[in-house]
Amino acid sequence: MSNFLHLKYNEKSVSVTKALTVRFLTKRFIGEYASNFESIYKKHLCLERKQLNLEIYDPCSQTQKAKFSLTSELHWADGFVIVYDISDRSSFAFAKALIYRIREPQTSHCKRAVESAVFLVGNKRDLCHVREVGWEEGQKLALENRCQFCELSAAEQSLEVEMMFIRIIKDILINFKLKEKRRPSGSKSMAKLINNVFGKRRKSV
């Protein structure tokens, strides 16, 4: 049985996120990407004896796309990879706003059984000499908002990029298991409630 896993990327610094995606899919690094169109990448993989179909949605960087409403994505995305550039503080501020939006108290129209998996990634670790965002800041933001966190360099660290994706996919699989566990327990509780109500009626008759 195959599972579909959907990941949503940060809507800013699109060349950075596309670099991570291409690293994961092909193990190659390409520095420049067109950022005026959105992309959906698909990959089939086997993990923990499960056949998985992974879909990665990478949005365009047009200003109108950067309002991070995320309403539709909160419905279908199983996980979010929020990427910022450690040498650009404004990208970190935008990543923070996106995480706050994802972790807002859930409204009725986008209520989920479990929280979405979120991975905060500080990219361009190879540019530490011009760093504007400290490692501690990223770690603190992740801990406060129940996210995983790492710093890496898409340009230099193919293995680290792959491991980051594997970690969030594992988080998503754990969430799938939690959903499955909650469904039967809810059914059992309802069956017990119905049995109690009708059982009492039978006794009274």
From Swiss-Prot:
The entry's function note states:
Binds GDP/GTP and may possess intrinsic GTPase activity.
Name this protein carries in UniProt: Ras-related and estrogen-regulated growth inhibitor-like protein
Organism (species): Homo sapiens (Human)
Broad enzyme group: hydrolase
Q: Which Pfam families does the protein's record reference?
A: Ras
Q: Which gene encodes it?
A: RERGL
Q: Where is this region: Small GTPase-like?
A: 1-205
- Residues reported to bind GTP: 11-18, 58-64, 123-126
The keyword Methyltransferase appears for this protein: no
GO-annotated molecular function: G protein activity; GTP binding
- What is catalysed by this protein? GTP + H2O = GDP + phosphate + H(+)
Question: Which keywords does the record carry?
Answer: GTP-binding, Hydrolase, Nucleotide-binding
Phylogenetic classification of the source organism = Eukaryota, Metazoa, Chordata, Craniata, Vertebrata
Q: Which family does it belong to?
A: Belongs to the small GTPase superfamily. Ras family.
UniProt-listed Enzyme Commission number(s)? 3.6.5.2
